[in-house]
């Protein structure tokens, strides 16, 4: 009789059911804007956030000498997206010192290490590759890495470890305000559907979602190319120009087309971008049944009182 072989079933973060978690954030110097250390209390992965101005303090710690993966976070790109560079090193402190001399854009580093110092170079290489791939897929940040390179050869048991490490790191990064791996759009409902809203008229034919962060206009949505006269000289006109300059909206004939999913701070800003005029997004965005976003979301809150 053949011996049964164990199966390595690798689940990505988006495949895991959301569940309550306890996260601890430690402030070594008592400064909430200084170095911060985040952990999920039942796991061995730690994320240390280091302001560039406090890099010298981090270098003095034993954690800086460990194998780890790091994220350099910085100023906005031309497309209006925050920048990130993802790397790994057998000694993260030494590598950050090098990056301090060679890269200008970043102002904070987030370092992923093991509490038990059990992360190996093999782990780090796979984690770097997977993190870059996942960040590109999410599309939230402008990735400063050039080429992701080939998938590194990693034994199946170590790869399983890496997926668990990545899941933990993704949660901790988001907790520290850097949701590098989270998609803009909402997950499907239990019925496998998404709650979509539509903006039509005034040259617009857009699709989007209302999320916890704002309003996401989907890739492929079409909008009006020219602004109406009342928008000229206003901040909204410059806002639309930046979207075009950054390649978020691409001119195509007499229209603009969204080249990617894009998060707006409010439904109204999303409607302005599509229609080229002042607009109340709560009224312009409508569900498939014709109900406005206001009726579906804001009025629902009132009825819950």
PLM region descriptions:
Residues 287-305:
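C-terminal engagement modules used by replication, chromatin/transcription, nuclear envelope/ESCRT
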Residues 72, 89, 111-113, 219, ...:
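Hydrophobic side chains in beta-strands
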Residues 2-101, 118-126, 130, 168-195, ...:
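GIY-YIG nuclease catalytic motif and its immediate N-terminal context
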Residues 88-92, 211-214, 300-301:
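A short, sequence-level motif marking secondary-structure junctions
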Residues 101, 132, 136-140, 177, ...:
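Hydrophobic/aromatic-lined pockets within catalytic cores
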């Amino acid at each position: 009789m053949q011996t049964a072989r164990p199966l390595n079933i690798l689940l990505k973060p988006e495949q895991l059911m959301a569940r309550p978690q306890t996260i601890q954030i430690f402030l070594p110097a008592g400064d909430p804007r200084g170095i911060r250390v985040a952990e999920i209390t039942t796991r061995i992965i730690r994320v240390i956030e280091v302001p560039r101005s406090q890099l010298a303090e981090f270098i003095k710690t034993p954690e800086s000498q460990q194998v780890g993966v790091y994220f350099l976070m910085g100023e906005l790109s031309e497309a209006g997206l925050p920048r990130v560079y993802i790397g790994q090193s057998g000694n993260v402190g030494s590598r950050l010192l090098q990056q301090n001399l060679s890269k200008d854009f970043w102002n904070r580093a987030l370092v992923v290490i093991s509490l038990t110092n059990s992360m190996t170079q093999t782990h780090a290489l796979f984690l770097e590759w997977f993190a870059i791939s996942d960040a590109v897929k999410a599309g939230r940040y402008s990735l400063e890495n050039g080429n992701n390179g080939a998938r590194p050869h990693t034994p199946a048991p170590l790869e399983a470890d890496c997926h668990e490490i990545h899941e933990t790191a993704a949660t901790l990064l988001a907790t520290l305000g850097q949701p590098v791996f989270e998609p803009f759009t909402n997950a499907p409902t239990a019925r496998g559907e998404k709650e979509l809203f539509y903006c039509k008229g005034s040259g617009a034919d857009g699709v989007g979602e209302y999320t916890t962060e704002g309003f996401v206009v989907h890739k492929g949505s079409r909008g009006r190319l020219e602004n109406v006269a009342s928008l000229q000289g206003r901040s909204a006109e410059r806002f639309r120009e930046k979207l075009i300059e950054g390649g978020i909206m691409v001119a195509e004939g007499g229209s603009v087309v969204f080249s990617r999913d894009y998060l707006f701070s409010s439904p109204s800003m999303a409607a302005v971008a599509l229609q080229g005029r002042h607009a109340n997004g709560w009224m312009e965005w409508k569900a498939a049944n014709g109900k406005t976003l206001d009726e579906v979301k804001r009025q629902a809150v009132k009825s819950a009182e």
